[in-house]
């Protein structure tokens, strides 16, 4: 997610601040033209801070999920893709 694709706005009714995406997505017709321009604003900093706070709060859970997925991926690559980690075959002893 590119945080500078969002703009901080105030809700006219509730007066709460929220982020609204103003940048087109890759599939949009105007995307190629839009990418020719460079926008920089400090408005995305609160969103970045909020995302970092969420990551910090759930850091242990995130790493646990990554570790579980890494173990699954290692098993899948070893067993299913390369056939290097199968059960040992009985070979005659010398």
Curated annotation (Swiss-Prot):
Domain of life: Eukaryota
Pfam families associated with the record: DUF3456
InterPro entries: CNPY, DUF3456
Family recorded in the similarity comment: Belongs to the canopy family.
Protein name according to UniProt: Protein canopy homolog 1
């Amino acid at each position: 997610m590119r945080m500078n694709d969002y703009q901080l706005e105030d809700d006219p009714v509730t007066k709460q601040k929220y982020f609204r995406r103003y940048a087109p997505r890759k599939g949009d017709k105007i995307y190629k033209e839009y990418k020719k321009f460079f926008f920089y604003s400090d408005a995305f900093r609160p969103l970045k801070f909020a995302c970092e706070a969420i990551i910090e709060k759930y850091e242990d859970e995130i790493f646990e999920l990554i570790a579980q997925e890494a173990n699954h991926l290692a098993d899948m690559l070893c067993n299913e893709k390369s056939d290097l980690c199968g059960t040992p075959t009985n070979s005659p002893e010398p």
